[in-house]
């Protein structure tokens, strides 16, 4: 299973094609739209989110609410394109018409300068339109689709914000994932700690007032995963490596860890390895310091993945840059942006992880029909229970 996205930030819209999804999977489009709505929310978002009201339009691969096995195409309209039709038109522009909103002053921290150098774009808008995080709306749609597939085999995902602007949320325990999800969905910054949420929002307000931006750390948990997804036999088959690559592909993410991650540098092996036990349901671990992976394979414990997002590079008090036309020093271009997108980014990270897990399930148990996948997963769970 794989997917491709296409589209620019201020173009007509975003297209995503999912290939290799099983036939016979019932899909609720309203659930996909609900995930897209969550992505647009969160304290610190900019004015763009007041313009867009993202919803998917299915253009292939789903008939009467069920996948057919053919490539699935989603379309998400960019409502803001109305204001950018001339700037983003596909047709050649007449020579006597000035190109509007041309970008010649790259923003530090963005793809602008290096992208222009690589593809020889003298108008850096050709870079920033595609490198924009607007593309993540398409990936959230893919992830929402994959979450419905995973639900059919007993796998669920949950994401939340741990840190914003240096303010850290305290850990909490809940009786169920549903209870924890309700708390996160009710939080303006998608965190489990209400007191920390207030401090995080103050940090966001301070950054906005100063024309600055702040980043943070997001966490994703995956529950119900069977042991043995991924493989130790080749470097590129390790599932934790695939997830790490997927997370690092999300705009502005600069680091990823599983379980206690970098904290393990300060602890002896006796405190970070997870003891093995055997019971009525087969093998288990007495702890989960390693975050659900050993040797690049799932252990059956929840996957625990944390990732750090840098502050958004677009600043309303821009840093020094250089005009690529004149080579003179100027302040960087200002584009409409968020002060903090960490809450929304937690949903994007969850989405890309959902895709990697769903892809691995299909590669392990087949991807022709959903019923066959479910049957094979049930057989595998029973096999491992008595192994």
UniProtKB/Swiss-Prot annotation:
The keyword Amino-acid biosynthesis applies. GO terms for cellular component: cytosol. Its cofactor is FMNH2. Its EC number is 4.2.3.5. One of its GO terms (biological process) is chorismate biosynthetic process. Homotetramer. PANTHER family: CHORISMATE SYNTHASE. This is Chorismate synthase. It comes from Exiguobacterium sp. (strain ATCC BAA-1283 / AT1b). The lineage of its organism: Bacteria, Bacillati, Bacillota, Bacilli, Bacillales.
